[in-house]
């Protein structure tokens, strides 16, 4: 880190002599005043003063700095010079994330020291808290602080792919997403004392926070590195995205409660993983831009037998398809083990969702293949069109009493009086299967047409 030029540059900019002297002077002065006033009260509020300053520094100040660290470079037209340097994406990520907020952490660690000191000075007027638990609290504060900084920086890096100038409102929005991390912090210390059960073991709220925040920070930092790789003209490895989806599934799968008789509670982890990966896939489609299909590059790499490069330009949304299909198989097996008709219909509903998703993939890729102008720069429009078929169209069909057509626009089960329950459930997958085949044929014809144009 100390051989990182970006980190060193930001450190010299942030840690000036005046600022280094001002921070402890401010905090110690306020602490001494609070200590004097605190003597007249029946209980001590000194630790809460320290936590208050930590929250102000972290959630108000550092989130702003993290959101602005790249946007300032964009607005000042200096980001392009940094992109052309020989610095690695990892060093740039470390420099931007930790260098721009190092002064905040200088103040935060002073707050942490005063926080621990408060429990030593006023042991008789504060709840007895063992030192290991106090150190765990400090660790949680650090993890929440890093998470609150990673989120706005990641959002700002993602947004610069589409725009090259930003207003204060944009930065405030990114900052607000980091500020929102204060809500789970409050719940950990005040609202979730019972903890959770994960993979059959009971964890307190603080233990769960350490585990899940650590996972979030690791993948958040990897995502920042991948975004910077894209800015540097390098393609991030699809393997990292695949491993991220697997880790997301592994985390959520642990919430299954196999001791419950309620299927929704019993398989809540698998259901959450399925819908989470499904949602992440659609969000990825929105952000892939014209990377969704690169027929000219595909043709070039394929005929040149550059299979590694061909693998590198694979759309991230395609990487998640095997994960979603495996989750669908697991859900089908779990619902099938219930031995109930409802389990059979639920299994068919899951596969109907898969077929609708594949239909949307074909439609969105077909759109991006021939989109022109701004439409080619983003797949947001076709994604919104595809998702509207699950909301607007079914509502209209319900309004005009045309429910018989709902299975063509959303996973919909209707028990027919002319068929058995299982036959009615099977019919759930027929409409999306037909639509998927139709869109797949259109996509195939479009790809062939595009390749013919490239040969000419």
Segments (PLM) and residue ranges:
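Hydrophobic alpha-helical transmembrane segments of membrane proteins
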Residues: 1-76, 95-456
């Amino acid at each position: 880190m100390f051989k990182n030029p970006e980190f060193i540059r930001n450190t010299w900019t942030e840690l000036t002599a005046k600022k280094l002297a001002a921070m402890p002077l401010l905090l110690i002065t306020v602490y001494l005043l609070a200590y004097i006033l605190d003597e007249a009260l029946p209980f001590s509020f000194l630790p809460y003063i320290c936590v208050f300053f930590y929250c102000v520094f972290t959630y108000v100040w550092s989130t702003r700095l993290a959101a602005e660290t790249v946007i300032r470079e964009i607005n000042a037209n200096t980001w392009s010079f940094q992109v052309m340097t020989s610095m690695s994406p990892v060093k740039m990520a470390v420099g931007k994330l930790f260098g721009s907020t190092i002064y905040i952490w200088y103040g935060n660690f002073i707050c942490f020291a005063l926080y621990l000191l408060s429990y030593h000075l006023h042991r008789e007027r504060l709840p007895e808290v063992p030192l290991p638990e106090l150190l765990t609290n400090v660790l949680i504060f650090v993890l929440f602080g890093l998470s609150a900084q990673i989120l706005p920086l990641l959002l700002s890096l993602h947004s610069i792919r589409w725009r090259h100038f930003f207003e204060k409102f944009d930065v405030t929005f990114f900052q607000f997403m980091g500020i929102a991390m204060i809500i789970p912090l409050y719940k950990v210390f005040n609202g979730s004392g019972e903890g959770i059960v994960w993979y059959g073991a009971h964890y307190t709220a603080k233990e769960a926070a350490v585990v899940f925040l650590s996972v979030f920070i690791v993948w958040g930092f990897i995502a920042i590195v991948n975004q910077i790789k894209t800015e540097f003209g390098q393609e991030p490895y699809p393997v990292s995205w695949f491993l991220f989806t697997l880790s997301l599934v592994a985390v959520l799968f642990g919430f299954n409660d196999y001791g419950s008789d309620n299927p929704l509670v019993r398989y809540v982890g698998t259901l959450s993983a399925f819908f989470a990966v499904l949602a992440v896939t659609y969000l990825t489609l929105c952000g892939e831009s014209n990377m969704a299909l690169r027929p000219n590059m595909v043709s070039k790499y394929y005929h040149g037998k550059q299979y590694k490069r061909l693998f590198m330009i694979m759309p991230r949304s395609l990487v998640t398809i095997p994960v979603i299909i495996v989750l669908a198989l697991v859900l089908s097996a779990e619902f099938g083990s219930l031995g109930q008709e409802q389990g059979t219909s639920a299994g068919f509903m899951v596969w109907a969702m898969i077929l609708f998703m594949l239909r949307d993939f074909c439609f969105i890729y077909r759109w991006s293949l021939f989109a022109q102008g701004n439409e080619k720069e983003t797949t947001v429009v076709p994604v919104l069109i595809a998702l509207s078929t699950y909301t607007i169209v079914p509502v209209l069909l319900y309004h005009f009493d045309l429910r018989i057509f709902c299975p063509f626009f959303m996973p919909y089960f209707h028990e027919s009086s002319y068929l058995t329950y299982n036959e009615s459930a099977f019919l759930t997958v027929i409409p999306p299967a037909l639509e998927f085949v139709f869109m797949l044929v259109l996509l195939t014809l479009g790809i062939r047409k595009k390749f013919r144009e490239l040969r000419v």
